[in-house]
Curated annotation (Swiss-Prot):
Coiled coil: none annotated. One of its GO terms (cellular component) is small ribosomal subunit. It comes from Bordetella pertussis (strain Tohama I / ATCC BAA-589 / NCTC 13251). Disulfide bonds: none annotated. PROSITE patterns: RIBOSOMAL_S4, S4. GO terms for biological process: ribosomal small subunit biogenesis; translation. Residues 31-51 are annotated as: Disordered. Residues 97-162 form the S4 RNA-binding domain. It comes from the Bacteria. The gene is rpsD. PANTHER family: 30S 40S RIBOSOMAL PROTEIN, SMALL RIBOSOMAL SUBUNIT PROTEIN US4M. Keywords: Ribonucleoprotein, Ribosomal protein, RNA-binding, rRNA-binding. This is Small ribosomal subunit protein uS4. One of the primary rRNA binding proteins, it binds directly to 16S rRNA where it nucleates assembly of the body of the 30S subunit.
Amino acid sequence: MARYIGPKCKLSRREGTDLFLKSARRSLDSKCKLDSKPGQHGRTSGARTSDYGLQLREKQKLKRMYGVLEKQFRKYFVEAERRRGNTGETLIQLLESRLDNVVYRMGFGSTRAEARQLVSHRAIELNGHTADIASMLVKAGDVISIREKAKKQGRIRESLDLAASIGLPQWVEVDASKMTGTFKSAPDRADVARDVNESMVVELYSR
């Protein structure tokens, strides 16, 4: 399955929640009507969604939120299942530990897509070495920095200013003046993806 490159608001409207695919520079309400699905007739009434349909929607929601395709998403699920602890919570922690997501959480990119582009354009260093694989998993204590030649990019400074005004998550520590940050730990489940029911994703893959 190819990566979706169409309107981002359409995906958020389809899932009925903000997938954080757009920059927070403007309120999402001014861009997307989340209470209506995309299409000519919008949300239909009276039709009950099956359990399978609900489970599939939750999986699609997670995949779209983190910008991950099916093959890679399944790999994360298999790894989450292999590890100790709650499979659904571990799955979300793995997604949160992706390099592109951590770059986004640190405020270097205003969206995950923008953060992924910074990684693919070799603007990011991980522990002092250039990192250009968005799916790399970051570990507690890892240091992420903007490469020297990329520090003049205006969009990075704008994103950092925006992140500072909104507030950074507690599991990252960022020195905006040096454009460097530390991944302190994987986030607690209660702090991320609050509109996702990951247990339905586990049920879907367990069918």
